[in-house]
Amino acid sequence: MKASDQYHKWVEWSDEDHIYIVKCPDVMTGIHGDDPIRLYSELCDVVDEVIQHFVSEGRPLPRPRIRPMQEVL
């Protein structure tokens, strides 16, 4: 399992902006565009790069906080 696999990633459509937005909130805000499959792949690459940066700096990885079906209070 890759370190990035522990972080929830999702794709959503923005009716307001008429674009797809992909997010990984525990690691970064997100990116947007018109091809959800390409965007998801790019997001995974960026998350891997962010994790590599954390490791190279000797910083701990962010704790995964977002989970699918997590109860919202």
Residue ranges and their predicted role:
Residues M1-H8, D17, I37, S41-L73:
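Short, charged, surface-exposed hinge/linker loops at domain edges
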Residues C24-R38:
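A short, exposed loop/beta-hairpin motif centered on an aromatic-Gly-Thr core
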Residues V11-D26:
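Short aromatic-glycine-(Arg/Gly/Cys) micro-motifs in beta-strand/loop hairpins
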